[in-house]
């Protein structure tokens, strides 16, 4: 199919691989087809007439149709991932060298406006930017299959890491300052101050944000291993990952860490521009502010998430149905929390939700409604009791898309 799409787009040879535009278009078409199919089935249309008389059979058929369509969307997304990586790789390189060009234009305009002419400091600043951009270009080439420069900022869950992004920004500024001082010495400057007295605050902040990367990774790894945090791999990184949690909701601890670090970083860059002959002199009050922001960020990492838990299991009752005990073939409603981990609300992860009922593993059916799904949800699951479940006392547990199993609750099944 990829070869056919490449030919349709005018590729000269199938050896060139699939066309990136076709891959993106194929993914968009798959998403549109899934949404249309979900909304059609939500209104009761499209179900085979032979199954319409059986609510259980029609619900299972609808769930299987949606699951297959969701897998198609996921497959299309994986095919488009390579094209996205190429675009991101090129875009980041364009941004890096665009920043160098902007610096050159800014220096030229300020030199003309102030009438100071081109100085050795301007040459050193431009040279440091070119060297740093060249280093980033080389690093991007090594990781071009994962998005170039942004690959250094990706976490294990394929999301942009807030701690890594902040640490990378401070590291780039520190390297730029060192290259600037080195080039100032090369150009013959005599007033370059290489003492650490003025740059001690910068070094402390750099150590803080670097330690934060290690600590955040350790906290997340330990909480995932202890099943106190559920992590689902994202389909793609997004800029919003820096300020939001895995579910795309704004996160206060992440946002304050980015804003505080960004504001202090800008002030440090301004101080470097005003005094390019020494490391930026960062006041200790601002260093303390960054330390407080780091502490809040790490405490937020310790508090996020939680283990999924079942509170109760009851017989699902429809309107007009009589109250009765749970019997084979009935629907059971599982009430609790954490059944849909953050980032697992997409259709494909929802299809991996499983209920363990004694020795039987029952997949939770997808029940569509216009614009979403009525089942499963984060707090309730409805699943039919399989016929293979023997009457008697059985234990029920839920296995989420993250692979975490809940506690077990015993129920009595009557014949």
What are these regions (language model features)?
Residues 139-151, 183-191, 212-229, 276-282, ...:
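Juxtamembrane/interface segments at transmembrane-helix termini
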Residues 130-136, 202-217, 261-274, 280-303:
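Alpha-helical membrane-embedded segments
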Residues 152-153, 221-245:
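Juxtamembrane inter-helical linkers in multi-pass membrane proteins
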Residues 110-126, 186-201, 275-284:
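Membrane-helix interface and helix-disruption motif detector
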Residues 2, 6-90:
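Basic, amphipathic N-terminal segments
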Residues 173-189, 256-277:
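Alpha-helical transmembrane segments and their membrane-interface junctions
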Residues 80-98, 158-172, 237-263:
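Loop-to-transmembrane boundary segments
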Residues 303-415:
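Ser/Thr/Pro-rich low-complexity tracts
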């Amino acid at each position: 199919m990829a070869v056919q799409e490449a030919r349709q787009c005018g590729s000269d040879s199938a050896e060139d691989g699939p066309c990136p535009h076709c891959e993106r278009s194929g993914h968009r078409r798959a998403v549109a087809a899934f949404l249309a199919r979900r909304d059609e089935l939500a209104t009761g249309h499209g179900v085979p007439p032979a199954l319409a008389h059986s609510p259980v059979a029609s619900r299972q058929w609808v769930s299987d149709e949606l699951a297959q369509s969701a897998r198609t969307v996921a497959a299309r997304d994986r095919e488009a991932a390579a094209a996205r990586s190429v675009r991101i790789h090129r875009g980041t390189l364009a941004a890096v060298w665009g920043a160098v060009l902007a610096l050159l234009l800014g220096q030229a305009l300020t030199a003309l406006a102030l009438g100071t002419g081109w100085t050795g400091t301007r040459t050193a600043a431009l040279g440091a930017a070119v060297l740093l951009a060249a280093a980033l270009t080389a690093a991007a080439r090594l990781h071009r299959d994962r998005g170039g420069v942004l690959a250094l900022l990706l976490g294990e869950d394929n999301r942009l890491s807030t701690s890594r992004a902040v640490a990378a920004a401070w590291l780039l500024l520190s390297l730029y300052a060192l290259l600037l001082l080195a080039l100032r010495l090369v150009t013959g400057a005599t007033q370059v101050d290489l003492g650490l007295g003025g740059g001690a605050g910068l070094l402390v902040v750099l150590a803080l944000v670097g330690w934060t990367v290690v600590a955040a990774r350790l906290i997340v790894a330990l909480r995932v291993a202890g099943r106190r945090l559920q992590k689902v791999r994202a389909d793609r990184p997004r800029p919003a990952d820096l300020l939001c949690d895995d579910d795309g909701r704004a996160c206060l601890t992440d946002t304050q860490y980015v804003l505080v670090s960004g504001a202090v970083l800008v002030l440090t860059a301004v101080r470097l521009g005003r005094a390019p002959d020494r490391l930026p002199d960062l006041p200790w009050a601002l260093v303390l502010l960054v330390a407080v922001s780091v502490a809040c960020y790490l405490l937020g990492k310790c508090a996020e998430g939680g283990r999924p838990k079942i509170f109760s299991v009851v017989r699902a009752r429809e309107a007009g149905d009589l109250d009765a005990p749970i019997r084979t073939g009935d629907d059971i409603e599982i009430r609790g929390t954490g059944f849909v981990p953050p980032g697992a609300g997409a259709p494909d992860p929802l299809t991996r939700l499983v209920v363990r009922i004694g020795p039987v593993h029952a997949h939770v059916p997808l029940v569509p409604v216009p614009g979403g799904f009525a089942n499963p949800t984060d707090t309730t699951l409805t699943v039919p009791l399989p016929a293979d479940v023997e009457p008697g006392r059985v234990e029920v547990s839920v296995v989420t898309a993250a692979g975490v199993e809940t506690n077990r609750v015993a129920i009595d099944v009557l014949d």
